[in-house]
């Protein structure tokens, strides 16, 4: 059984963390935010996943 275990290198872990979930995770979150389910992360997700930010009249908001 111990032969089934694979030890990940630091670079493999970093790569998985940096790419984890994209794009499916981002599209799922976008759909949930668009449906009105906001757990306080929608602004962050729009910025992180899509890099979309809208500035108007001194305030900023994210949009698709």
UniProtKB/Swiss-Prot annotation:
Annotated localization: Secreted
Coiled coil, from the record: none
Signal peptide: 1-21
Any Gene Ontology CC annotation: extracellular region
Keywords: Antibiotic, Antimicrobial, Bacteriocin, Disulfide bond, Glycoprotein, Secreted, Signal
Disulfide bonds: 26-49, 33-42
Glycosylation sites noted in the Swiss-Prot or TrEMBL record: 39, 64
GO biological process assignments: defense response to Gram-positive bacterium; killing of cells of another organism
Function: Has antibacterial activity against L.plantarum ATCC 8014. In purified form, the activity is bacteriostatic (IC(50)=2 nM) rather than bactericidal.
Protein name, as recorded: Bacteriocin glycocin F
Organism: Lactiplantibacillus plantarum
Gene from which the chain derives: gccF
